[in-house]
Amino acid sequence: MMKRILLGLLCASMSLCAVAQNRVTKVLIPGARGLLAAEVQMPENKGTGKCPITILAHGFGGDKNWQLMKLVSDSLQMHGIASIRFDFNGHGESEGDFKDMTVPNEIEDLKRVVRYALQLDGCNGKIGLLGHSQGGVVVSMTEMNDTISAVTLLAPAAVLREDAIRGNTFGVLYNPINPPEYVELPGGRKLGREYILTAFRLPIYETAIRYQGAAFLIHGTGDRVAPYSYSERYKNIWKNSELHLMEEYDHGFSRHIEEIADLASNFLIKHLL
């Protein structure tokens, strides 16, 4: 009997995985610096077939295949919400050179993905945004009109502006007033001069305050990349927001991705359905 139960659970799990895989479409979306590689994950059609869509924005040096974001997409799909995971320019499978990436051109990338989502036949016009680290900053600075119904920021790295002002990014020192053509980061990636110059002057919170819809912030108190005080500042300017401080969790929530994915998904489901 126990073997039959386990076999049944295994088959059910495999069926869910098969449904998820069959409803994922790889697409290319024109971005600020070339084509953006993206994956559109749709739920099973119900009723009119129209559903909300959440767009997920990865962090600095990351990509759309980060396990936490895939977990969020799968959870949303099972609750009738579509998602788009994409690589910013110069990242993952997208076109562009990492050296030419800046926060402003990532904002433009995200705007174009939002426009793409709104044109999809299956979209009902309600959009959710989720961003991690620098992706969280990009989400917070992207123009959000009435179509944006919910925003989730995971460890938003608004510290990037102060890093540029100090001339210290990931421990690499440079002259912030007159930076070189590029600085080489640990791991070999090259951070371009334009990134530094634009980060130096980013009006992060001055822009983010324009959004006053539902927002959810998750930040680890053990984050050594972007201190949680940056999320506290978002909480102060967004009156309709919740802040969850996770005791001793790191910047990537490395040992807790399932928990963070559940928290983020539940918030988006609540506000998009």
Residue ranges of predicted features:
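N-terminal cap/lid segment of alpha/beta-hydrolase-fold proteins
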Residues: 21-47
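Catalytic nucleophile-loop/oxyanion-hole region of alpha/beta-hydrolase
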Residues: 29, 64-65, 91-123
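The serine-hydrolase catalytic nucleophile loop
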Residues: 61-73, 88, 229
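Conserved alpha/beta-hydrolase
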Residues: 73-95
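Hydrolase active-site cap/lid region
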Residues: 146-193
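Short beta-strand/loop motif that positions the catalytic acidic residue
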Residues: 211-212, 217-219, 223
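Conserved alpha/beta-hydrolase "acid-adjacent" motif
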Residues: 224-230
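Catalytic histidine-centered segment of alpha/beta-hydrolase-like enzymes
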Residues: 249-261
